Amino acid sequence: MQAIHNDKSLLSPFSELNTDNRTKREESGSTFKEQKGGEFSKLLKQSINELNNTQEQSDKALADMATGQIKDLHQAAIAIGKAETSMKLMLEVRNKAISAYKELLRTQI
């Protein structure tokens, strides 16, 4: 038994798990998290801008329908349906984000 405890060659595969390597991984992980946080923010802003554009197209289609300037009624209906679906999706994303935030607040440390 003592030979096993004193033989450091048996521990060589585990020597890579020392604190220096762990610190490097943690540092790179924090950088990764910061980058991903920025990416999420960009994605969210992009999605909101796309939703806004879709809503504007829908409003224009409705105005054109009301004034009789629209030539293709089907395209207007598609634009309105697309805007409605996009809004529902964004509301669900918002609801899930709020739910996740509330769950984090309830988490005890």
From Swiss-Prot:
Coiled coil (UniProt feature): none
Molecular-function GO terms, alphabetical: cytoskeletal motor activity; structural molecule activity
Region feature Disordered, mapped onto this chain: 1-38
GO cellular component, one term: bacterial-type flagellum basal body
A UniProt-annotated Pfam family: FliE
Keywords, ordered alphabetically: Bacterial flagellum
Bias type Basic and acidic residues, positions: 19-38
Subcellular location: Bacterial flagellum basal body
Record carries keyword Hydrolase: no
Signal in keyword set: no
NCBIfam families attached to this UniProt entry: fliE
PANTHER family in the cross-refs: FLAGELLAR HOOK-BASAL BODY COMPLEX PROTEIN FLIE (PTHR34653:SF1), PTHR34653
HAMAP family: FliE
Stated family: Belongs to the FliE family.
Protein name: Flagellar hook-basal body complex protein FliE
Species in which this protein is naturally found: Helicobacter pylori (strain ATCC 700392 / 26695) (Campylobacter pylori)
